Amino acid sequence: MRIIKLLLLVCVIFLQMGCSKTEVTILMPRTASTRVIYAGGQLKDALAGFGYDPVVVTDSLQSTKVIGQDKGICISLLQASDTTGLKKEGFTITSDGNLIRVVGNDGTGVIYGCREIIDRLEANEGSFDLPATFTDAPEMVLRGGCVGIQKMEYLPGRGVYEYPYTPENFPWFYDKAQWIDYLDMLVENRMNSLYLWNGHPFASLVRLKDYPFAVEVDDETFKKNEDMFLFLTTEAEKRGIFVIQMFYNILLSKPFADHYGLKTQDRNRPITPLVSDYTRKSVAAFIEKYPNVGLLVCLGEAMDTYEDDVEWFTKTIIPGVKDGLKALGRTDEPPVLVRAHDTDSKMVMDAALPLYKNLYTMHKYNGESLTTYQPRGPWAKIHTDLSSLGSIHISNVHILANLEPWRWGSPDFVQQTVNAMHDVHGANALHLYPQASYWDWPYTADKLSDGKREKQLYRDWIWYKTWGRYAWNCRRDRTDEINYWNNQFAGFYGTSDGDGAAIRMAYEESGEIAPKLLRRFGITEGNRQTLLLGMFMSQLVNPYKYTIYPGFYESCGPEGEKLIEYVEKEWKKQPHVGELPLDIVAQVAVHGDKAVDAIDRVAPKVKENQEEFLRLQNDMHCYREFAYFFNKKVHAAQHVLNYQWGKDMAELDAAVPLLEESLVYYRRLVELTKDTYLYANSMQTAQRRIPIGGDNGKNKTWAEMLVHYENELANFKANIATLKAKTAGEFIEEDKQITAMTPAQVTLITPLKSVRLQVGASIYSDRDVKVQALAPELEGLTAYVMSSARQRAEGTAIEFEAKEPVSLLVGYFRDDQTKYAKAPKLETDASANDYKQAEAKLT
């Protein structure tokens, strides 16, 4: 208490001597930590902005000699000397006349206490209006944003996630002023962690004595990277922000892989002593060199089995961390975070906790989209299983594929979502992706008239503010929150609070559209689908054909029915259950109307950030046109499904005007976006398949998609005409001869016996099984006789040479058996379409 008493003495002397009303003295101990000093600096700058004349002094005796004025305000910044029973990062503010005291439970608590004062000054137009006592602390332990050090397309000669840290690849990474803005934004929103995502960062940041050739950057760039990481961690530390580096497994440095004749990543590669040693030493070197940087471990997307995940984590990653700590002489255990993606995280944690105690777990909230604040099902169970382990469990708001690219920021949706994270999943930490354009950081998809690029931090301020506010405390009164957000929007756009309410309403109404549509009609929540480009009739009529991601419908929304299920129940006169598809498309149309009405009503009254408001207004109109487009198309799909059940041609005829009307809305959408957006989806690789392939950055705009939808309508009309002609006996159907594929000319290096593929052929050397039937396209191709036992034990490898490109067909079983390899899934294997293998060629 000595420090507190001394500071109070200084303040009393200060008040007795008097000072100007506009002068504020900020007092802090001479031994103040970097975080307290930062807090004082932030408070000083804010006070100056409100017209005060602030000065920062320490608690030396000389301080009393420089304060002598008439009247003033004294704010003392302290850290609690006894933290027993106090929550980390919490604070208490006491106010007695002109004497204000901020006592943080730790240095970060002082920062947040000062932020509380700043927030109240902003809300009260610069006047101090503080309660006698105010105490607060965060609910969530970690609250952080992530930045992807990744790009929208692959680098030449490299695979997914393989992006060395270089000025050529990421010029923004070396912009220190931009990082300061980001870190200060995190503080403003009371976030305490920064996640950097990259496939294999080690080869850009550390040198290994045993593998000096593994470094992927030149010496000059390596020094720049060292400087940037030192700068970033130093600036983050003074703000109470924990920097965490994410990496995928098993990924190798390209020069390392080339040196040993390996692939940088191979999902079917077994763990070998070489790749384990390299990775273990990389992790150790990183921990030793950057002791204040945590690790987020993704045991995928290039690992073979769950058993491999356990072995890799317990025998490579954790030993690497311990090696680095040992080199530093540290006996503590810094946090290591484990993603529950493409792995059995419970199995991993059960094996790892006896070896390393300070483990956190992380799992995606709604997969790679935002669909509901009512999560349930098998994915919710993954969360509850992990949160029950006793360690901190992090909810990962990931990618947001269904929200790209338009503005989204519904405070009500976010608050209910964070409540669900706590109450349904048992999570106590937040990991937050950008709202859109993750792969294009720091830019948005907006096309500006001057050719410049808009920054995400400016456009999506509401995204970070909502999540930060509710990660701190989600148990806030709804009425109070409505007033709070009305004021926030009013402040940003220069309107009254009443008009700010209209902007909030536009955000909250539009904020229901994409979540509702994806959870009721989507094929997947993942990057594979870009919802806001639309869907084809075939995808609405039979989503199963496009491989619905398992668990998606059971987990990412309230119980309900797909359109195909709804129509079947209608025909069978069965009762419906839960959320229904036709209700949803009706609701989103209403949401769109309300959003547009609200935003248009306030447009003439906006005085600040007017150009940004026009972009927001345009987005609301985009949402409305999309909602109506989708509504009409779903009703058309309903008629097609009715035809499949009743064979009534009138159903198909009824679908035509609905499809035509859907295109009217889509053409309006093209007009709204052609001069305002560069793209819809920021991942512009072969991973994007729904509504159509996005290879090489194609089919990423609404204008491109309009051509496909117009062709779809033309084909639909032609097919109806053909059906009618057949019914009338006016159509002469020609038998089409199915031509067998031509065998490729290859030179086989692997010694295998060949056999002509036909009914009765034997294709296993150790099993008495024969081909019973096959597609005519495959008749006469060359098959190779394999050992079933060897395939199971060692996998399958066929080495051959070809003088020209050839196609290799791989067959997969439809059922869920485990005897054979499963068809590739882009949701868990980003390399699943590197050879165009993600889509069926013959079914």
Per-segment meaning from a language model:
Residues 4-15:
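Sec-dependent N-terminal signal peptides
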Residues 159-160, 434, 453-701, 712, ...:
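C-terminal non-catalytic alpha-helical accessory regions
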Residues 787-790, 796-807:
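Extracellular and analogous surface-interaction loops
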Residues 63, 124, 172, 192, ...:
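Catalytic-core regions of glycoside hydrolase
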Residues 736-792:
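Glycan-recognition and processing domains
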Residues 22-25, 31, 39-42, 46, ...:
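Feature activates predominantly on carbohydrate-active enzymes
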Residues 677-702, 750-754, 758-760, 818-843:
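Polybasic, proline/glycine-rich intrinsically disordered low-complexity segments
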